[in-house]
């Protein structure tokens, strides 16, 4: 009978946040796969957990996955932990879970801390809908592409960032998204936890005199639907109604459908659009 993979969330700062279920599981499994064994040994020693460990990280995740799957196929139960937070959320775990499913091995997730959710709840920004992007890509072209995609994102946006890249990221956000409300969170769950409720522009000014310290979570206000609608309406007003009609007709819409869509875009009645086109025809 095959073993099972346990995805175990660990504290992001305060050791008291570990769950009883995770503690029991870490003691009972046959092996713990850890992102950094040097870091995780501190957690295990604190809770007097003697289970053997092996490394599983970004640079060995595929090759090591085959080794771990082989052990589970032999009946061993394995727990996966990262340096902090929930496996698979901007940390190793996604590929291992997928490969386990392909191999017919059961996977279960033991919920717990996640910096993105902790920061979101602290932000004071809308929490019902959000877009989690983790770290922006280092590649300039890919980074710019994602920022452009986020420009019209109406959901609350969550990013992770390292201190040495923070100012650059804030400047890029200001350039692409404009000056939005945001919250910057640091040292989450720790004694010196901070949450700056501010704007992108104010943070840029703040870090002109202060040195960024520690990895942080950026929670950024989504774009206002009203603002988008007003911008779109303004863009339609730059073209004639005939040109506007042509756009929709070229997309395959009937003339009747196009008139309805043009009227909606411009805040007009369908009858007004029809009358305008009739008048133009008669000129």
Locations of the language-model features?
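Glycine-centered tight-turn and secondary-structure capping sites
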Residues: 92-96, 255
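Glycine-rich, flexible N-terminal cofactor/catalytic loop recognition
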Residues: 1-59
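Loop/turn-to-beta-strand initiation segments
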Residues: 3-5, 74-79, 155-156
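Class I SAM-dependent methyltransferase SAM-binding "motif I" and its flanking Rossmann-like core
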Residues: 95-153
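Conserved helicase motor
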Residues: 54-62, 136-139
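Short active-site oxyanion
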Residues: 26-32, 104-108, 156-157
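A contiguous loop/helix-start segment that scaffolds small-molecule binding in enzyme catalytic cores
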Residues: 2, 156, 163-283
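Short glycine-rich anion-binding loops that position phosphate/pyrophosphate groups of nucleotides
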Residues: 12-13, 83-87, 163-165, 223-225
């Amino acid at each position: 009978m095959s073993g099972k993979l346990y995805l175990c969330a660990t504290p992001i700062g305060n050791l008291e946040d570990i769950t009883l279920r995770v503690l029991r599981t870490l003691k009972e499994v046959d092996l713990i796969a850890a992102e950094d064994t040097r870091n995780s040994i501190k957690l295990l020693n604190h809770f007097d957990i003697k289970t053997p460990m092996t490394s599983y990280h970004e640079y060995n995740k595929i090759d090591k996955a085959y080794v771990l799957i082989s052990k589970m196929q032999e009946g061993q139960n394995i727990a996966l932990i990262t340096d902090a937070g929930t496996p698979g959320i901007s940390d190793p775990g996604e590929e291992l879970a997928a490969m386990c499913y392909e191999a017919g091995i059961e996977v279960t997730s033991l919920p717990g801390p996640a910096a993105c959710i902790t920061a979101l709840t602290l932000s004071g920004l809308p929490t019902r809908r959000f877009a989690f992007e983790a770290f922006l890509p280092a590649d300039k072209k890919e980074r710019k592409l994602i920022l452009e995609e986020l420009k019209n994102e109406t959901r609350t946006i969550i990013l992770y960032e390292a201190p040495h890249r923070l100012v650059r990221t804030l400047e890029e956000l200001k350039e692409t998204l404009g000056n939005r409300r945001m919250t910057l969170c640091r040292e989450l769950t720790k004694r010196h936890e901070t949450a700056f409720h501010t704007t992108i522009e104010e943070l840029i000014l703040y870090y002109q005199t202060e040195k960024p310290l520690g990895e942080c979570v950026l929670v950024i206000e989504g774009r206002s639907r009203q603002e988008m609608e007003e911008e779109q309406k303004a863009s339609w007003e730059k073209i004639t109604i005939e040109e506007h009609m042509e756009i929709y007709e070229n997309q395959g819409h009937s003339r009747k459908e196009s008139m309805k869509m043009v009227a909606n875009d411009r805040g007009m009645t369908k009858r007004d659009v029809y009358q305008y086109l009739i008048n133009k025809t008669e000129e």
